[in-house]
Amino acid sequence: MTNIRKTHPLMKIVNDAFVDLPTPSNISSWWNFGSLLGLCLITQILTGLFLAMHYTPDTTTAFSSVAHICRDVNYGWVIRYLHANGASMFFICLYAHMGRGLYYGSYAFRETWNIGVILLFTVMATAFMGYVLPWGQMSFWGATVITNLLSAIPYIGTTLVEWIWGGFSVDKATLTRFFAFHFILPFIILALAMVHLIFLHETGSNNPTGIPSNMDKIPFHPYYTTKDILGALLLILTLLMLTLFVPDLLGDPDNYTPANPLSTPTHIKPEWYFLFAYAILRSIPNKLGGVLALLLSILILALIPMLHTSKQRSMMFRPFSQFLFWVLIADLLTLTWIGGQPVEHPYVIVGQFASILYFLLILVLMPVTSLIENKLMKW
């Protein structure tokens, strides 16, 4: 008799995705981040649900409701900090997952990659709106500055910003709608993640060599379920250490001051995971130009499959491309650092140089290097 997991309509779907899935035998720990992102998402949805039970999306009570969660709700402080630091862990996993895709040429699966880019945008939007909810100084001014960028759009800009705000400034209407969107978006992310997986399972996983591995596949369970559990335990350990020992390490002290429209903080900056994009935005002294550069810095990911000029899929056997890849990582870390610094010399010029290098690497240097490597293969 056939096992029920292979015949039952619902269990069959789970079985084909997590049990009997043929998986390359040589995928490394860099392939763990997909499952870790799933774990992060579930954690965020659960902690967020419990926070929403005690939070009030109103300008007069939002800040004190968060204080109430931390002081009066049973283990409310744990839930709140798990949620805040969970977002940081989410982005660490997200960037590692994307870096893996870039390095090993996983972007050759066009549909999977494009859904991934859409997922990135959705997660970024969710994180931004979540940061506004505690209604501290950085929440308010972050929301004001970032939404105001849309006013750079010719002709409809100002109208669009006021439409998003629901008034003439960031106020009660803005907070309420941000809370509504922050609640619904994770479920949209969940649905998109399923589509992401469906497309991935059409082609099967890539592997470090970039060479098709159909003749050498092993079942996902027990090999990769075990490997994923190890990754999950390390993720949980890191998250718990952050939450229980240094809960405010990645946050901004300004957000412990209630929002005040009459007092602007000295340095307005987003959470650490947006700093690289914020640095690119600030490095262009023109509002519309900055907004376009900001958008392009993320949208450029959608162009990656078209910019692939190498005859090899993975960078595993391409030392020059590997070097440029790590230069790109160093450049992004530099941009992240610059984004957190004040707008003054020498940070401005370093930021401008790093921004130019970012686009130059992706659009010119890496494709040209790949062509040179193709020529070298014939020698």
From Swiss-Prot:
It is found in: Mitochondrion inner membrane. Heme b b566 binds at H97, H196. Pfam families: Cytochrom_B_C (PF00032), Cytochrome_B (PF00033). One of its GO terms (biological process) is mitochondrial electron transport, ubiquinol to cytochrome c. This is Cytochrome b. The keyword Zinc does not apply. PANTHER family: CYTOCHROME B.
